[in-house]
Amino acid sequence: MQTASSLSVLTPLNEENVDRKSSWSKDTIAVQAVGSSPSSSSSHDFESKEDAEGMNKDESAPSPSTSSPSSASSRSQSKYVRKEALPPQLFHHLDSAKDKALTTFEEIQECQYASANIGKPPENEAMICDCRPHWVDGVNVACGHGSNCINRMTSIECTDEDNVCGPSCQNQRFQRHEFAKVDVFLTEKKGFGLRADANLPKDTFVYEYIGEVIPEQKFRKRMRQYDSEGIKHFYFMMLQKGEYIDATKRGSLARFCNHSCRPNCYVDKWMVGDKLRMGIFCKRDIIRGEELTFDYNVDRYGAQAQPCYCGEPCCVGYIGGKTQTEAQSKLPENVREALGIEDEEDSWENITARRQRRKKGIDETSKIIEEVQPTPLTSESATKVIGVLLQTKDDLLTRKLMERIFLTSDPSVCRSIIALRGYNIFGLMLKKFSIDIEFILRSIKTMLSWPRLTRNKIQDSNIEPVVQEFCDHENEEVKDHAKTLLKEWESLEIAYRIPRRKPGQVAPQSTNAEPSNNQSNPPLRDQEPQRGDKGDIKSAINNSTEDLSKKHPALHSSRPSDSRSRSKFGNDYQSHSKHNLFRKNSFPKRRRLSNSDTPSETTTPNNEQEQVSNQANKVDLNKIISAAMESVNQKNVLKAQKEEEERIAQQKREEKRRLAYEESLKRHAKKLHEKKTKSSQDATIDHHLTSHSPESIAFKAVLAKFFANKTARYQEKLGKAEFKLRVKKMTEIILKKHIQLVLSKKEKALPDELSDSQQRKLRVWAFRYLDTVVSRSGTATTTPTDSPSIGESPKKAA
């Protein structure tokens, strides 16, 4: 977020403007400023624009008695009273105002960058996490919440091109626009607001703050432009030093998130690919219907303060302080956590100290960082520190965070730092502070004290060439420690990791595999079911028996009712042949004669009836067993088909992941090669481009010829010797200017010839130069030496 130190150089554009918020401004402030405006005319001016700002006229601002400076001052004086936090207020009963809010700006899906180089982090190398693809129901759940993904813990999003965690992992919320369910509603005093449309757990990604990313020069220009257009309220958020997100005319719903002195959300900066992006996250569990708010960290510019209507017990009464000198700047949430600063909200001593600093005009942000007493890291704070070190460009903050790492001696915490790319961080810091002997010495000593078992992390970070440069350092202590560190690293071995199964590799199939789809099925009567399908056969037989009993009750009524024969059919089933299956059930059992039976009672049916009954039983049972075998066979075939389809689909998924992985490795290798090639070319230019280089001599001849021809009329006024001296002097000035542009990467190389625009500018400058020489009698001590900038007009050059 915006801090006072980052914009303290700005001057108020117009003291009559009601309010200016350099980091944040909302159309809701138009209503807030009505009660405290200096005159009634300004109040009417605001009210006439309520419809344009999305406000209803019947929802007017509070009366002066409720929002006057005196009442606001009383709120400010009572802010030090410790009060209990109020329960969250819910607004889900209010109607949605999203459609109306969308008419006040142009909604865009991605940030729009003013140039290709803007929005890039300090270190633009791809960070690869250690996670591996883990697929559940077709979804890659790698790098999810609680997965200890290094990228996720250090506010870096994974990308499919540069990581081995697989495509579409869970750490791609910015890229996939996985925003929370939110809605826009109309507040009582603050204009539009943003509310949760569902219960949101802590640390949920709410929304990305989207807009136009512009440099500081364009930011200043837009401040003046919006002021001339009559736009009273701007939407600027600082992305990093010298770069801002402007959501005034183009943005997302995140622009409607209001300020609160006790917010339920916070803003965090994430590295997504080669760009930095700002997101709003839940600071605590949020209930559906709650308004989503965060601390604006405002540095105000203007004559009047903006009253705060958050309604919290700790409310300071104003956004940005009562006066311009009291504009309170705060550190971003992630920076405070990285520095180990505890909440100062209710501390009287800290409030008094801040007041004194503001009265003396001291840069409060820098002073806070300087006054922080570094403490050793814990495993939890290590992730915060590494995340900020990868994003910040502030040298003071970097040194303070590195001091915390230097003080850390706990082996478990040191191992956590190493796992969180500690060697990468130290490599960057050694390059950044390469002339600070004390910093270099402490860095090398810290790495010497780290526990190390293998060489893997050291090799992956490419820190050895960086330390190797200090082996020839002029300081003997630095040289000795660097050699000792390299010697210890060389004695370590690279740990061998058991390789995972390669993408596309399929486990060997067993000999009992199910038949594939293209295999022809043998005839039903020759195919025997597997032993594992015995239960399926019994079930199919029972079902078929029940169906036939319903269709042919006469056939089944003549079947013997001996329960023992039916139970033997199921329990004694061993063979799958029809003969063995019906051997015991072909004929009904005859009842054994007893002594008391008479011949008439034991008389058997005639042979014809018995033969018909037996034949019907055979037909019936043949149908049952045929239906059962067919049912089992169909199940086996379907099962085999399903397994074969799943196996083919798995092969395709693995092949796709393998190709994506190989492609990402190729792209990563290509980027590294291009970076090395570019750095070597730049180094060649830096070391060989001087005023005596062949290209410099050639360009010098072009300049000398140009100045001699275009300024020949001054030869009579100055004399031949003096004229030649001045031509030589002008040539050297312009040559030196171009060499500086090439060395600073603003120009690729010295031009072979001068363009028409360059000739015009140089001719005007040369005439002014020689006129000045003539007017000053051509003395060497009074000769002008200012050189023109090729991109400037002749007036500016003069």
Curated annotation (Swiss-Prot):
It comes from Schizosaccharomyces pombe (strain 972 / ATCC 24843) (Fission yeast). It is found in: Nucleus; Chromosome. The gene is set2. Residues 1-11, 507-522, 595-615, 777-790 have a biased composition (Polar residues). The modification Phosphoserine is found at S67, S594, S596, S787, S789, S793. The keyword 4Fe-4S does not apply. The modification Phosphothreonine is found at T545, T783, T785. The lineage of its organism: Eukaryota, Fungi, Dikarya, Ascomycota, Taphrinomycotina. Histone methyltransferase that trimethylates histone H3 'Lys-36' forming H3K36me3. Involved in transcription elongation as well as in transcription repression. Its main location: nucleus. GO terms for biological process: methylation; regulation of DNA-templated transcription; transcription elongation-coupled chromatin remodeling. Residues 304-320 form the Post-SET domain. Residues 124-178 form the AWS domain. This is Histone-lysine N-methyltransferase, H3 lysine-36 specific. Residues 627-674 form a coiled coil. Keywords: Chromosome, Coiled coil, Methyltransferase, Nucleus, Phosphoprotein, Repressor, S-adenosyl-L-methionine, Transcription, Transcription regulation, Transferase. GO terms for cellular component: chromatin; nucleus. PANTHER family: SET DOMAIN PROTEINS.
